């Protein structure tokens, strides 16, 4: 896992798609915030990476251990996959979701309704990433709701849930007697 870069303010972990249309303005907003930020963005344009990789932003070419990284992060920025969003919330971290597809958009709506983060819909032109990041950093209600989620599901064991699902599927596949 890479070391966090120097910077001011909360630590951001960004898990991003290289094809995200708002990637350049998002990275510009993150750079302007000077928050220490770790970014995983497979396939990012080398020129874009070079422009922002520096004092407060560090890019990783390799996938990072999210379970080890999240306890050190303060805010998560992602596109809203179910797994990434669930991991962030189970770690008690507020999230900025930037969906690129319908499923992620629906997850974003639920997250915003619950109050554990903010989202910017894909059709928003001139998205104000800076204001969203500032709100997540300065308004404690988002972190409080994320911690509420983490506390509520503290007993969640992924392996136990998977075993239960497999057992139910196997039972459903058994011929009726």
Regions found by a protein language model. Name each.
Residues 63-110:
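A donor-sugar binding/catalytic signature common to diverse glycosyltransferases
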Residues 1-75:
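Donor-nucleotide binding loops and adjacent catalytic segments primarily
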Residues 128-177:
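C-terminal amphipathic helix plus adjacent low-complexity
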């Amino acid at each position: 896992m890479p070391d966090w870069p120097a910077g001011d303010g909360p630590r951001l972990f960004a898990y991003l798609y290289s094809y995200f249309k708002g990637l350049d303005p998002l990275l510009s907003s993150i750079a302007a915030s000077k928050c220490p930020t770790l970014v995983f963005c497979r396939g990012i344009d080398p020129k874009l990476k070079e422009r922002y990789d520096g004092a407060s932003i560090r890019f990783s070419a390799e996938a990072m251990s999210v379970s080890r990284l999240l306890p050190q992060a303060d805010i998560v920025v992602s596109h809203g996959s179910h797994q990434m969003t669930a991991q962030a919330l189970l770690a008690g971290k507020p999230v900025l979701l930037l969906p690129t597809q319908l499923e992620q958009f629906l997850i974003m709506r639920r997250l915003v309704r619950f109050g554990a983060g903010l989202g910017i819909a894909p059709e928003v032109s001139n998205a104000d990433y800076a204001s969203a990041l500032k709100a997540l950093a300065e308004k404690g209600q988002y972190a409080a709701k994320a911690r509420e989620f983490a506390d509520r599901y503290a007993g969640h064991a992924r392996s136990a849930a998977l075993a239960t699902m497999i057992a139910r599927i196997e039972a459903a596949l058994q011929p009726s007697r």
